Amino acid sequence: MEKKKVVLAYSGGLDTSVAIKWLQEKNYDVIALCLDLGEGEDLEFVKEKALSVGAIKSYMIDVQEEFMNEYALVALQGHTLYEGKYPLVSALSRPLIAKKLVEIAELEGASAVAHGCTGKGNDQVRFEVSIQALNPYLEVIAPVREWKWSREEEIAYAKENDVPIPINLDSPFSIDQNLWGRSNECGILEDPWAAPPEDAYEMTVPLENTPDQPEFVEIGFEEGVPTTLNGTTYSLSQLMKTLNSLAGKHGIGRIDHVENRLVGIKSREVYECPAAMTLLTAHKELEDLTLVKEVAHFKPMMEQKLTELIYNGLWFSPLKQALVAFLQETQKTVSGTVRVKLFKGHAIVEGRKSEYSLYDENLATYTVNDEFNHDAAVGFISLFGLPTKVYSQVNQKKVEA
C-alpha cells in the first residue's frame, strides 16, 4: 500500500516528535515544517531533529518579517487586546503557520497536514479553520487529540520508539513565543490565586531589579508602521527585537490574565509583551493626534470585533478582511514621532508630533494667541441643545396640565 504524505507543524518538543512516529504507524510519510517566528531557539537543530526522529524531509523557514508585516502589524494598528489585556501572541502566529502548512503540502503533493494541539485549546480551532479556508480539500490530523494519552503514556511510547526526550520535560510550563511576545501556562499558573514564580518570565526583569532611572525612546511611524527607534531605521522584526530588549529591561509588558477561551473554559496565562505593549501605547497616542473625532470614536468598536475574529481563528474570514481594509484606510495620516518614557513597568508617552497633527495650539490655547471664535459658541450651543430643550418643554407642559 502506497504511503500518503502529511506535513506536520513541528516544534521539536515531545508531542510533535512522538507525532512523527505515530503518523508513520498510520502509513504516512511525514514532512516536518518548522517556522522561525523570532522565538530565539536553535531551529536548525530542530530541523535536523525531525529527520533523526523519522521525517522524510524537514523544512525550516524564516518568516519573521512576514509575521511582523502581515500579522503583527494588523494587531498593532487594530489595537487588538483580547478582553482588554491579551495582545494575541499565539493567535497571531497560527494563521501564518497554517498558511505555510498548506503551501508546503501543495508543493509536496501531500494529502494531509497535521498539528500538535490538544482537544481543549484554542489553537486547534485556529489551525483547522485557517486550513479549511486556504485549502478545504486537505485532510487535517491532530495526533495529540486522537491518541488521548496521559503524559506518562506518551513518554513511555517515546522511549519504546527511540524518540529523544527533551531536556526541559520536567518544566511545568507550556510556553509559546514569537516576536510579538511570550505566553506561558500550566504548572502553578493553573491556580489563579498563586503568584507567578519568577522563572515563569524570561523577556522581562522584575520591577525590584529594574533601573532606578527612566529611559526615553522616540518611535517614528509612517502610515501606522513603526519604522525608526531613536532616529535609527529598522525593519519591523529588528525594531521588535531591539524594543523587546529595551522595554523588557524596565519590566514592561507583564500580563497576568484569566481569559475566556473559545472552547468554553477559562484559563489563566501569563504573557510578556514588552515591545508590543510599548508600541500599542505609542501608536494609540499618535492616532489621538491625527485621526478626526468620528474615526477615532468609531475605530474602537471595529477593533473589538477584529480582536474577537483573530482570537477565534477567523483570520481568513471575509469580515476580517473587510475590517482590515477599513483599518488600512485609517492609517494614511498616522505618521509622526512619539516619545516614550520606560520606567518601572510603565511605558508612558511624554510627547508626540506629526505633520498631520489635527491639534492646533492657536485654537486650543487660553493665552493672547487664542484664535478660537468664542462668539460662535452661542449659536452652536443653541442648535446642539435644541432637541433636549424641546423635549423638556413638551414634558413640562404635560406635567403642568
Swiss-Prot record:
Q: Which reaction does it catalyse?
A: L-citrulline + L-aspartate + ATP = 2-(N(omega)-L-arginino)succinate + AMP + diphosphate + H(+)
- Pathway note: Amino-acid biosynthesis; L-arginine biosynthesis; L-arginine from L-ornithine and carbamoyl phosphate: step 2/3
The protein's matches in InterPro entries, at most eight in alphabetical order, are given as: Arginosuc_syn_C, Arginosuc_syn_N, Arginosuc_synth, Arginosuc_synth_CS, Arginosuc_synth_type_1_subfam, AS_cat/multimer_dom_body, Rossmann-like_a/b/a_fold
Q: Which PROSITE patterns match?
A: ARGININOSUCCIN_SYN_1, ARGININOSUCCIN_SYN_2
Q: Does the keyword Ligase apply?
A: yes
SUPFAM superfamilies in alphabetical order: Adenine nucleotide alpha hydrolases-like (SSF52402), Argininosuccinate synthetase, C-terminal domain (SSF69864)
Origin superkingdom:
Bacteria
Gene Ontology MF, one: ATP binding
Q: Which residues bind ATP?
A: A9, Y10, S11, G12, G13, L14, D15, T16, S17, G116
**Cell compartments where the protein resides:** Cytoplasm
Chain sites annotated for binding L-aspartate: T118, N122, D123
GO cellular component terms, semicolon-separated: cytoplasm
Subunit annotation: Homotetramer.
NCBIfam families annotated for this entry? argG (TIGR00032), PRK00509.1 (NF001770)
Q: What is the recorded name of this protein?
A: Argininosuccinate synthase
Q: Which organism is it from?
A: Bacillus cytotoxicus (strain DSM 22905 / CIP 110041 / 391-98 / NVH 391-98)
